[in-house]
């Protein structure tokens, strides 16, 4: 649930796949460590009593049995359904993109104390890399298969079913989703809608060829959240819009680092994005950063970093605070052909329990019961109405609205620019490790 809005705006079943069995495809970047016995030493073996032999029959050379391959299967299916721990049985998940610190922080790459501190974070890194590899495999399949004519519900649930399968947490038993799985509702945001749109039950909206769709989803293992997003467009007329935002996000990632000021990152992002323009139906539009959407810190089980969370602007000015060692950030940028400013619009689907929610006596029994379900299944992780439906909850809207009214649950309505405009988004999660920056969600796709 990547988008974090500026304060002024903030105040305003897993289903089995039918048809043929899943296709198996190789998993990229998986090291092959198996030792397979060569068959070369069987060459030239001769059977006993061959024609023309004059002596005793030659003894047949004993074949050595081939060693069994170690570990689990080395392939993923299409759609992704193989739990990742069976593909990486030793929890040796792929490393993200490693970027050495520069300038005054260049010493961190070789400093022994920093390297020692980094080695202490093995569990932290393993959980993050697990979540990141799930994200990569799920999104890369989604990018290949998302097509015009699909409903937004089909797209969102396809992604969610894959995340649940690869993490091994279907979220149907109490507390299971807190161990791992979906970190927040899958955003499938069309055109002028930039963020926080996920279909509610009964939604029949269909993806069209001329649409620009932002796909934003999160994966977590033990509350270590990987937040990453990409944009899908079928008409090449939007290529420059997507290129502008992807370039701006990569600029933000490049500039981010320990002791870097947030305002400096925002200025660099804005300069990059505004260097692009896009022509649509004969009209040329400058690509504008959406100035009231930001990147953000990520905390354990808290997508926006909790009480002491920080924002990463995508325009110049503003926050003078600095990034610090050990922090986790979602670096995301949004570009628009509209005003470059979003407002709440359309029906709400995203909700999250407030981490330090007030202890308010609830009069509605439906609100009390729903709060218990939310706490035990999502904690402070965001959820949507479809997830409550999936848990068998019904007639819960009155109770949900009561929790929102009492400040116990926050509602996150869709965030939209002016109608007729087009918006794009790209996002990655980065770890500011003591000795190196790791773009944990980086893949060959973006």
UniProtKB/Swiss-Prot annotation:
CDD domains: MetAP2. Residues 32-44 have a biased composition (Acidic residues). A divalent metal cation 1 binds at residues 216, 227, 427. The lineage of its organism: Eukaryota, Fungi, Dikarya, Ascomycota, Pezizomycotina. Its main location: cytoplasm. The keyword Metal-binding applies. Binds 2 divalent metal cations per subunit. Has a high-affinity and a low affinity metal-binding site. The true nature of the physiological cofactor is under debate. The enzyme is active with cobalt, zinc, manganese or divalent iron ions. Most likely, methionine aminopeptidases function as mononuclear Fe(2+)-metalloproteases under physiological conditions, and the catalytically relevant metal-binding site has been assigned to the histidine-containing high-affinity site. Cotranslationally removes the N-terminal methionine from nascent proteins. The N-terminal methionine is often cleaved when the second residue in the primary sequence is small and uncharged (Met-Ala-, Cys, Gly, Pro, Ser, Thr, or Val). One of its GO terms (molecular function) is metal ion binding. It is found in: Cytoplasm. It comes from Blastomyces gilchristii (strain SLH14081) (Blastomyces dermatitidis). It catalyses: Release of N-terminal amino acids, preferentially methionine, from peptides and arylamides. GO terms for biological process: proteolysis. Substrate binds at residues 196, 304. Residues 57-72 have a biased composition (Basic residues). Residues 1-88 are annotated as: Disordered. One of its GO terms (cellular component) is cytoplasm. This is Methionine aminopeptidase 2-1. Its cofactor is Co(2+); Zn(2+); Mn(2+); Fe(2+).
């Amino acid at each position: 649930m990547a988008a974090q809005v500026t304060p002024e705006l903030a105040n305003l079943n897993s289903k089995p796949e039918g048809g043929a069995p899943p296709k198996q495809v190789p998993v990229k970047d998986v090291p092959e460590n198996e030792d397979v016995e060569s068959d070369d030493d069987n060459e030239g073996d001769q059977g006993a009593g061959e024609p023309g032999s004059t002596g005793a029959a030659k003894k047949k050379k004993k074949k050595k049995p081939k060693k069994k391959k170690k570990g689990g299967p080395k392939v993923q299916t299409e759609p992704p359904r193989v739990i990742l721990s069976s593909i990486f049985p030793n929890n040796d998940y792929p490393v993200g993109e490693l970027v050495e610190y520069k300038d005054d922080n260049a010493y961190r790459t070789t400093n022994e104390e920093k390297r020692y501190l980094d080695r202490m974070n093995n569990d932290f890194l393993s959980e993050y890399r697990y979540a990141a590899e799930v994200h990569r495999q799920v999104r890369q399949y989604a990018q290949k298969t998302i097509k015009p004519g699909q409903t937004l519900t089909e797209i969102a649930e396809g992604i969610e079913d894959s995340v649940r399968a690869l993490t091994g947490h279907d979220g149907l038993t109490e507390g299971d989703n807190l161990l791992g799985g979906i970190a927040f509702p899958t955003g499938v945001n069309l055109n002028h809608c930039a963020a926080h749109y996920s279909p509610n039950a009964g939604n029949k909206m269909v993806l069209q060829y001329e649409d620009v769709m932002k796909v934003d989803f999160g994966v977590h293992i033990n509350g270590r959240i990987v937040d990453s997003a990409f944009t899908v467009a079928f008409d090449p007329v939007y290529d420059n819009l997507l290129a502008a935002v992807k370039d701006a996000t990569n600029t933000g990632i490049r500039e981010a680092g320990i002791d870097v000021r947030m305002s400096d990152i925002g200025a660099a992002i804005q300069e990059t994005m505004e260097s692009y323009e896009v022509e649509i139906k004969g009209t040329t539009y400058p690509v504008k950063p959406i100035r009231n959407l930001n990147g953000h810190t990520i905390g354990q089980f808290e997508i926006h970093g909790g009480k002491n969370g920080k924002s990463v602007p995508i325009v110049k000015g503003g926050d003078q605070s600095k990034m610090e060692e050990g922090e986790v950030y979602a670096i995301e940028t949004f570009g628009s052909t509209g005003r470059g400013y979003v407002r709440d619009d359309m029906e709400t689907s995203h909700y999250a329990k407030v981490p330090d929610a007030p202890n308010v006596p609830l009069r509605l029994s439906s609100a009390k019961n729903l709060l218990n379900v939310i706490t035990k299944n999502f904690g402070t992780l965001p959820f949507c109405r479809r997830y409550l439906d999936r848990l068998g909850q019904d007639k819960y809207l009155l109770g949900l609205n009561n929790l929102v009214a009492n400040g116990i649950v926050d509602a996150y309505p869709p965030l939209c620019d002016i109608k007729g405009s087009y918006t794009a988004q790209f996002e990655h999660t980065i770890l500011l490790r003591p000795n190196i920056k790791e773009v944990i969600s980086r893949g060959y796709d973006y």
